[in-house]
């Protein structure tokens, strides 16, 4: 299956392990520069990191939770590291470690990396948050990058850690534009009900609600009258319940459902194929996991987080001495790491008008003409108002 990013240049091998965000489920807004970190201190740290290599290759170790071959975050991270090796091989030395699924061994793997000759250690997801907060202070001479979450810079001296996560609300906004445009189109499985749906994992997870808010706002940007059904599985792994919720939404008129429910998303994809309706995946190009199977034909796109691109960009800055260690940055469309999957199914199944609508809105987002609200820091009353008002 041929694929590309609408908003990225790195062709990533991503699909349906469906790890939705994997960020903290706190509803508290995280600021981009926590604690007492200053721009001057970050610059000094970055320059020190550059000087540490003394003209030698920067030794970079990637630690992934789980294994490669997931066609999702891990494979994307691997692709980013391979791109580094191919394009910056004269400046970096790459090492990649699969930590497996036993969480009790994650800290040991991190300590092993710290005790090695690695200059820069990269890891990600909320499972590694507390470990990074602890170990980074024990090894101040090492540098760290953590993706899809952040560390709490108020806990101590974490000026050697760069945190980055992604504006999933922007990708979800484009998914909403696509869904609302598709339901009004003459696409094969579209109907005339002007109803679309969202199935999320937990209603207590800010990362899930961030996608819900973005999706609803994107849909309403296209048509303020579109109805958006919203359901929550209550779990990241209960695919049976996810399937039931999606079938109910399809039965109630939805012809496109955006799913952000982790591994439970499999149930929504099954429901789409059985109901002969459309779905939109999240985090990775989920159609890749179903290549050659009937289910792939109903996954018209996915809202993607470009982990591989962000790793490449961050390490490139680390090599140049410009990576702002001690800071947390949230990356979006303007950084080229958030967008919709553009593959052969998207090109063949989605109407030209819908594709044009997505492109037009993407340009508006890039130009700053359109902004998307975030569930992070949003009070519960406002959040519920957005969700209930859409239904």
Language-model features: locations:
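Positively charged n-region of N-terminal signal peptides that target proteins for export
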Residues: 1-10
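C-terminal motif of bacterial Sec signal peptides marking the signal peptidase cleavage site
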Residues: 17-21
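A residue-level marker of the well-folded mature domains of exported/periplasmic proteins
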Residues: 24-391
């Amino acid at each position: 299956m041929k694929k590309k990013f609408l908003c990225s240049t790195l062709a990533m091998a991503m699909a349906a392990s469906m790890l939705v965000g994997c960020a903290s489920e706190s509803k508290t807004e995280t600021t981009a520069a926590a604690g007492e970190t200053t721009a001057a201190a970050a610059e000094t740290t970055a320059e020190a990191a550059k000087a540490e290599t003394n003209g030698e290759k920067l030794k970079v170790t990637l630690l992934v939770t789980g294994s490669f071959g997931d066609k999702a975050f891990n494979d994307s991270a691997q692709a980013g590291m391979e791109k580094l090796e191919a394009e910056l091989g004269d400046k970096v030395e790459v090492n990649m470690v699969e930590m497996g699924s036993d969480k009790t061994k994650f800290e040991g793997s991190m300590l092993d990396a710290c005790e090695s000759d690695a200059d820069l250690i990269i890891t990600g997801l909320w499972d590694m948050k507390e470990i990074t907060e602890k170990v980074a202070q024990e090894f101040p001479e090492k540098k760290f990058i953590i993706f899809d979450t952040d560390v709490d810079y108020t806990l101590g001296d974490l000026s050697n850690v760069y945190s980055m996560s992604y504006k999933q609300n922007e990708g979800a906004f484009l998914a909403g534009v696509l869904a609302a445009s598709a339901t009004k189109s003459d696409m094969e499985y579209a109907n005339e009900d002007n109803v679309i749906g969202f199935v999320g994992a937990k209603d207590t997870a800010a990362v899930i609600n961030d996608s819900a808010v973005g999706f609803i706002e994107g849909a309403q940007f296209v048509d303020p009258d579109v109805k958006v059904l919203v359901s929550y599985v209550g779990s990241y792994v209960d695919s049976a319940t996810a399937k039931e919720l999606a079938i109910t939404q399809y039965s109630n008129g939805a012809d496109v459902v955006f799913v952000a429910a982790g591994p439970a998303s499999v149930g929504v994809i099954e429901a789409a194929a059985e109901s002969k309706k459309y779905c939109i995946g999240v985090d990775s190009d989920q159609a890749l996991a179903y290549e050659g199977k009937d289910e792939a034909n109903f996954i018209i796109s996915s809202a993607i987080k470009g982990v591989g691109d962000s790793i490449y960009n961050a390490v490139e800055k680390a090599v140049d001495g410009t990576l702002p260690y001690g800071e947390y940055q949230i990356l979006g469309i303007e950084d080229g790491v958030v967008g919709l999957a553009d593959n052969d199914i998207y090109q063949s199944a989605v109407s030209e008008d819908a594709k044009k609508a997505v492109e037009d809105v993407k340009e508006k987002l890039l130009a700053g003409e359109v902004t998307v609200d975030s569930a992070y820091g949003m009070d519960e009353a406002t959040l519920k108002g957005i969700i209930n008002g859409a239904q």
